[in-house]
Amino acid sequence: MRYLITGASGFIGPHLVRQLAADGHDCRCLVRSREKAGPLAELGAEIIEGDITLPESLDDIARGMDGLLHLATLGHMSNFTVTEAMFEKVNVQGTINIMREAVKAKVPRVVHCSSVAAMGICDDVPATEASECRPHHPYGRSKLKAEQTVLDMVNTQGLPAAIIRFSMVYGPGDWRDMLKLVRLAKKGLFPKIGSRPNLTPLVHVSDAVQGILCAAEK
């Protein structure tokens, strides 16, 4: 099968492309810069330079694809100067742009990777898909709005999409806050953040990849 992957040069993307290649699938990776796409090219992926916020760079990008795996996002830890408008541009409008290409190309299966941040503060424990979402951060609000646009296209345009909300993903190649915490723990240090116990759900990147593939295949 042939898969189009957005956000392929991020943290999860290379792990996903590696697994798809090992399973005998062909990958087309959308990246903003070829400079970061070397490892993907080494895995045999087709590299397409483009930007989900620029519709003209996406024209017919999904043609001939059997699946779209949409990972591209502007994360809440990307930069402390990120504004709500920037989250809206990338996470919401960017999602609309790539989903329109999927509809146009009649891609038979689409997976939209979202975040538990879309849920925000939830009174239900454990939470379910039916739990009320009250995101309190601009990032979470943008992820929820992106989900809603995908669902609207499912209902109005027949987009064959599944949505996955990931918690904190960790594993090899992770350069973000989890790496900093692990390094501190190895030194016998573990900072207490906040004034009360804080539980964070974690998922290993290999499990995240398997979740994406299951959603794509079912």
Where does each model-flagged region fall?
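N-terminal Rossmann NAD(P)H-binding glycine-rich loop of SDR-like oxidoreductase domains
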Residues: Y3-D23
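SDR active-site strand-loop-helix element
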Residues: T6, L30, L68-L74, V110-V116, ...
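NAD(P)H-binding glycine-rich loop region in Rossmannoid oxidoreductase-like domains
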Residues: R34-A41, A45-Q93, E101-K104, M119
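Conserved Rossmann-fold NAD(P)-dependent oxidoreductase catalytic core, especially the SDR/UDP-sugar
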Residues: Q93-Y139, V154-N155, A162
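Glycine-rich "substrate-gating" loop/helix at the edge of Rossmann-like oxidoreductase active sites
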Residues: H136, S167-W175, S195-V205
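Active-site helix of classical SDR
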Residues: S142
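Conserved beta-loop-beta element that borders a ligand/cofactor-binding pocket
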Residues: E147-P172
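Alpha-helical substrate-binding/gating segment
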Residues: V182-F190, T200-K218
